[in-house]
Amino acid sequence: MQSVFIEQAARVLENNWQDGFTIPCEGLYPFQWNWDSGFIALGWAHLDMERAKAEFRSLLKGQWGNGFLPHIIFHNESETYFPGPAVWDVGRSPNAPEARTSGITQPPVLGFVLEFLYDRSGETLLDFVREIFPALFRWHQYFYTCRD
């Protein structure tokens, strides 16, 4: 029975894979969401560690200059999703990245997800941890200095 659930979960992840990131739900959520990506990376860690790592890398393309990590990265176009990037108009901020994003964030789950990935893979993931950790640290600094 457990293998049936694993196969179904794998099928959902595969179907929602979008060339570098995974959408949470076809149609309803057509972009990359911050904490969804963390939980999605947990799933990918059981199936394909490279895709788990891709979730992080893709999400961090939306990190702002001040460390802020938004809740949505608009990697693609959608005429039906509201509020889209035009509503957020984050380009007005001097901290905004080139990527189109929202202007709010979500609870920071990526730290414990990174810990899980490392615990699962050990030393083979150390270079990835070294790559990602500074961005996660900057995000937590943002919370401490701007949201505390």
Predicted regions and their residues:
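Short, solvent-exposed loop/helix junctions and linker helices
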Residues: 31-34, 104
